[in-house]
């Protein structure tokens, strides 16, 4: 329906501060928690079909040519696109598609996004930076750290790479991936900070970020990912008065207690819309 959207004057950014058209969501690849993401190296598990350790996940439905066409069509229409992709092998296909689209039709400040980008490498992140993409990374280690076991401990340091992406200057946005993990921002922030599961196991401590950085990812990072950093993401003169009042300072409490912080008040557009006990 891209033609119909364009004919109606609709596109990424259309709307107002309450309701706005965002990116087009696309899928390329499979699931991290379902152990179906497509990888270059095999999972650290036995392939139930062969009895061998030769399971690489499930290849995407789209061929490279089909993916190239999809990304270019959305890009040419002037939309931002956010593409679900988890495994390093499927992400590499996606980067190839973005590279071709941008070479064919250069566009500055496109902010195309990869949703999840769960298993990567330094080389993949370098391409992400060069293509000026935004990463919307998982923060669900608290509930789903055990799902990372199938990928092998050697890979944990290159999964959900918030630390490395930030250090490289790649824009990172926070999210709950609700439906897979709970839409509880303070729990999500704790997960970014500790990389520790509910059972107390740490997965990839190299990718921990500070509470201050995690808050920024969830505020300014998320606002940037939808072209709203000039009106949202921080409390400043000239921006919308959207903020929450917390029961404690997440930068001051023990990191394993961040999840217990509650919302005392929510203010939207300068008006109180929620007050807790």
Which residues does each PLM region occupy?
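Extracellular/periplasmic ectodomains of large secreted or surface enzymes and adhesion receptors
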Residues: 276-277
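Metal-coordinating catalytic core of metallo-dependent amide/deamination hydrolases
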Residues: 1-88, 127-134, 189-191
